[in-house]
Swiss-Prot record:
Function: Catalyzes the reversible interconversion of serine and glycine with tetrahydrofolate (THF) serving as the one-carbon carrier. This reaction serves as the major source of one-carbon groups required for the biosynthesis of purines, thymidylate, methionine, and other important biomolecules. Also exhibits THF-independent aldolase activity toward beta-hydroxyamino acids, producing glycine and aldehydes, via a retro-aldol mechanism.
Modified residues (N6-(pyridoxal phosphate)lysine): K229
Family recorded in the similarity comment: Belongs to the SHMT family.
Pfam annotation, one family: SHMT
Site label Plays an important role in substrate specificity, positions: H228
Protein encoded by which gene: glyA2
GO terms under cellular component: cytosol
Protein name as it appears in the record: Serine hydroxymethyltransferase 2
Keyword Cytoplasm: yes
Catalytic activity, as annotated: (6R)-5,10-methylene-5,6,7,8-tetrahydrofolate + glycine + H2O = (6S)-5,6,7,8-tetrahydrofolate + L-serine
Length: 419
């Protein structure tokens, strides 16, 4: 990234910070499951002249003039999403996955309605009815969890709670669950109690697009997704459905219900990312993401670490650190010293607060974008294991420094996609 040739930019410390962040990304292993690297084309679209344009409303129904090309940009993003996921109706205006979920709630629910989602401790998301989130404050939220032994979603519990509480909306999907979802059974349960089914595929949308993860489209009334994470696009959200009636309600919930002007530069970047995901090489990428995650989880288990559910079907894994007597905050800190970025994550029955936790979440999407393969992830798993088992020893600093050098050497072989 070169910022030369502009006097104001050269004198602005902001751009020095951007360069430093680029160096951090280049020479670190990004294992945060919700992060990825956007292509130069995505970055260019997001930094384009569309930043300058207001466009409240929808295709051919804008509240501002000068939207001829804006309409075409948004329609391009919509048609690409329709083609990619097979959905009849797509709204690409949500600023984030959280606002996509909020729009669904606004469209389908009334304050005080019952909703049923996955517990945050078991891998759910804040927007699925957490008491600290708007979804938990405005609605009467109930939560299902995972089996304490297998770590898998307890579908019998889902059914029991649904039959007892008869929620208006059931939510499938989460932010820290490493296995497939039984969308068919979620659908049967929803039908049995007269509920609608929302699938939040923010994390695995790219894997669905690549044909490597089951699609919820045949089962869900409505689907929300993010366009970054495994889709490798800009930070943003979208909503998909095959129901024309719901689509109309959702459009009204986004605008004018929640948002004003859409971020057209971001929608353009979404169109780029969706176009990239339609290419044959994206299927290969999605498959590599899963292969890498499975190789990493398998090696971590062989080294004696405890993986939630014993492994993964997707791009992420969850390590339970309680057997080592460590916290997620500790492990996150020491891994970052070695140039490996992860995030602490709460677990079922976690005695630690969310700022500390007893687990960490790891993901393969970002490093797969750089071209890393299963052998690289096996090596990365060895480094993670070595650090975890050394944290309580006096030579942890030396071990982190040694692995930091190895990380730098490995990342040098895999340039960032925007370089």
């Amino acid at each position: 990234m070169n910022f030369r040739g502009n006097r104001m930019i050269n004198n602005d410390p902001l751009f020095d910070l951007l360069n430093k962040e680029q160096q951090r990304q280049q020479h670190s292993l990004e294992l945060i499951a919700s992060e990825n690297f956007a292509s130069p084309a995505v970055l260019a679209a997001q930094g384009s002249v569309l930043t300058n344009k207001y466009a409240e409303g929808y295709y051919q129904h804008r509240y501002y003039g000068g939207c001829k090309f804006i309409d075409e940009v948004e329609m391009l993003a919509i048609t690409r999403a329709q083609q990619l996921f097979g959905a009849r109706y797509v709204n690409v205006q949500p600023h984030s996955g959280s606002q996509a979920n909020q729009a669904v709630y606004l469209a389908l629910l009334k304050p005080g309605d019952k909703i049923l989602g996955m517990s945050l401790q078991c891998g759910g998301h804040l927007t699925h009815g957490s008491p600290v989130n708007q979804s938990g404050k405005w609605f009467n939220a109930f939560h299902y969890g995972v089996d304490a032994h297998s770590g898998l979603i307890d579908m019998d519990e889902v059914e029991t709670i649904a039959k007892r509480e008869r929620p208006r909306l059931i939510i499938a999907g989460g932010s820290a669950y490493p296995r497939h979802y039984d969308f068919a059974r979620f659908r049967r349960i929803a039908d049995a109690v007269g509920a609608m089914l929302l699938v939040d595929m923010a994390h695995f949308a790219g894997l669905v697009a690549g044909g490597c993860f089951p699609s919820p489209l045949a089962y869900a009334d409505v689907i929300t997704a993010t366009t970054h994470k495994t889709l490798r696009g800009p930070r943003g959200g979208m909503i998909l459905t095959n129901d024309a009636r719901l689509a109309k309600k959702i459009d009204s919930a986004i605008f004018p219900g929640l948002q004003g002007g859409p971020l057209m530069h971001v929608i353009a970047a979404k169109a780029v990312a969706l176009g990239e995901a339609l290419q044959p090489e994206f299927k290969r990428y999605a498959g590599q993401v899963i292969e890498n995650a499975q190789a990493m989880c398998q090696q971590l288990a062989q080294r004696g670490l405890t993986l939630l559910t014993g492994g993964t079907d997707c791009h992420l894994g969850i390590i339970d650190l309680r057997p080592q007597g460590l916290t997620g905050a500790q492990v996150e800190y020491f891994l970052e010293l070695a140039g490996i970025t992860v995030n602490k994550n709460t677990l079922l029955g976690d005695p630690q607060p969310p700022s500390i936790t007893s687990g960490i979440r790891i993901g393969s999407a970002a490093c797969a974008t750089r071209g890393m393969k299963a052998d690289d992830f096996t090596l990365i798993a060895d480094w993670i294991s070595e650090i975890i088992f050394a944290i309580k020893t006096p030579n942890i600093a030396d071990i982190c420094a040694d692995i930091r050098q190895k990380v730098t050497k490995l990342t040098t072989n895999y340039p960032l996609p925007y370089q």
